[in-house]
Amino acid sequence: ASVKNTRFLTRERTDGTDDQWIFLPALGRVKRIAASAGGGSFMGSDFTYADMASTTYDTTEAEHTLIGQETVNGRSAYKIKSIPYDPTAYVQTIIWVDKEHDLPLRVEFFEKDPTTVSKVLTTDDIAFVEGRWITKSVTMTTVATQHSTRVEILQAKYDIPMNGAYFTTTFLETGRLQ
């Protein structure tokens, strides 16, 4: 199915929860994503709506433990176990973070059982853009089916003024500033 002109908006609230909306051209309208649907597949992909908001936790959202140091795809990485205080989508993640660039190289997601990996996110490409290292493409693989979905950042711009109207459901629906 074509995803052309599909638009997705996530806004983090002050209480740490997210509001999410999606515009699907086939429906011609904006649809709010219920918080309970966060674990649902994002447009039939291996990503969930919760994954699209974030795949990591800050220190107020999870307990983080350094459990080792390993090499991932030739890069030296910290291996960190994160257990969220409020496990909604995942009960645990294990993240390999590039020591030099502070980017995730691999993330293992545990949905219900902290001993069984459900999904694996791998970083396929990183790039130096406008003075910072960024993740350019990632692949999420569902372990049970070995099906995967690749997401690629085609363009990134930083430190530019942004009109708040971009972050509204009106813009989501029309694709134009009012």
Language-model features and meaning:
Residues 1-26, 65:
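N-terminal mature ectodomain segment of secretory-pathway/periplasmic proteins
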Residues 177-178:
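Short, solvent-exposed mixed-charge patches
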Residues 55-63, 67-69:
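Surface-exposed beta-loop interaction hotspot
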Residues 9-11, 19, 29-33, 40-42, ...:
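Gly/Pro-enriched, hydrophobic low-complexity segments
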